[in-house]
Design a protein with these regions (language model features):
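Core beta-strand elements of the Rossmann-like FAD/NAD(P) dinucleotide-binding domain
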Residues: 122-130
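Glycine-rich dinucleotide-binding loop and its adjacent helix/turn
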Residues: 135-210
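N-terminal secretory signal peptides and thylakoid transit peptides that target proteins
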Residues: 1-16
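Short, well-ordered coil/turn residues at beta-beta hairpins
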Residues: 11, 134-135
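Beta1-alpha1 glycine-rich phosphate/pyrophosphate-binding loop at the start
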Residues: 28-102, 187-229
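A conserved short coil-to-beta-strand element within the FAD-binding core of flavoproteins
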Residues: 106-114
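Bacterial Sec-dependent signal peptides at the C-terminal "C-region" and cleavage site
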Residues: 21-29
Length: 241
């Protein structure tokens, strides 16, 4: 049975793993092999502790196309000017140097469950005894009426931290005086329920300093949201109106 990259990336908010059973030394005394797809918070943490807790008894390979991972958590503090971009960026050198993890910078393009292999976009194939899938989330092109992937450079979502976060910060800081910032909060369920409200709070902080006559409009399909009372109390105190 073969799984394409499209099939597993679109359901990628979860770590799918068969690590609940013990790994047994392979034929010829070879170490058992674990391949982790995705080097974000979930995948990198799984790879680190598999390597660390096994004390080198497991051969761990981490597949991640990017050279640096930017955390979505704390990215709102970057937008608000409380952190710089480097502080939310993490490279993979320490995973290799400190824990002996084999880091492969490539896309995982397919999985063959029967042969227990991961196919890479560059053409190589990685065999595994156990597989962890943690490739993160992304937008499905055309899933939102009137919006597609080509629009993200004009209307950055910044759900995936990095260049989108930097673009959003630049756009907020360069808004015309007295302009309007509009945010549409997603319906439940979605990743990080307080995230949209943290973000709009940081945008309000920036506009209060740089563009005090600007307006903020939030369109929200939910009647209640995470930490609603705390956010409303803070907005009334710091950004009334």
């Amino acid at each position: 049975m073969t799984i394409s990259r499209r099939k597993f990336v679109h359901g990628s908010a979860v770590v799918a793993t068969a690590l609940s059973t013990p790994l047994i030394m392979g034929a010829g005394g070879k170490k058992p092999r674990v391949v982790v797809v995705g080097g974000g918070a979930g995948g990198a943490t799984a790879a680190k502790y598999l390597a660390k807790d096994s004390k080198g008894a497991i051969d761990v390979t981490l597949v991640e196309p990017t050279r640096k991972y930017y955390t979505c958590f704390y990215s709102n503090l970057y937008i608000g000017g409380f952190r710089d971009m480097d502080s939310i960026g993490h490279s993979y050198g320490n995973l290799a140097a400190s824990y002996g993890i084999n880091v492969v910078h490539d896309w995982a393009s397919g999985i063959d469950r029967d042969k227990k292999t991961v196919r890479l976009a560059g053409g190589d194939t990685l065999p595994y005894d156990r597989l962890v899938l943690s490739p993160g989330i992304d937008f499905v092109d055309g899933a939102v009426p009137g919006w597609d992937l080509s629009a993200q450079n004009r209307m950055p979502h910044a759900y995936k931290a990095g260049s989108q976060t930097e673009l959003l910060k630049r756009q907020v800081e360069s808004m015309k005086q007295g302009g309007t910032y509009v945010m549409v909060a997603p319906p439940n369920p979605y990743r990080c329920p307080p995230g949209p409200y943290e973000r709009v709070s940081m945008v309000a902080h920036v506009l209060k300093q740089k563009n005090p006559k600007a307006k903020i409009l939030v369109f929200d399909p939910k009647k209640k949201f995470s930490k609603m009372g705390l956010f409303q109390e803070g907005w009334e105190k710091h950004y009334p109106g």
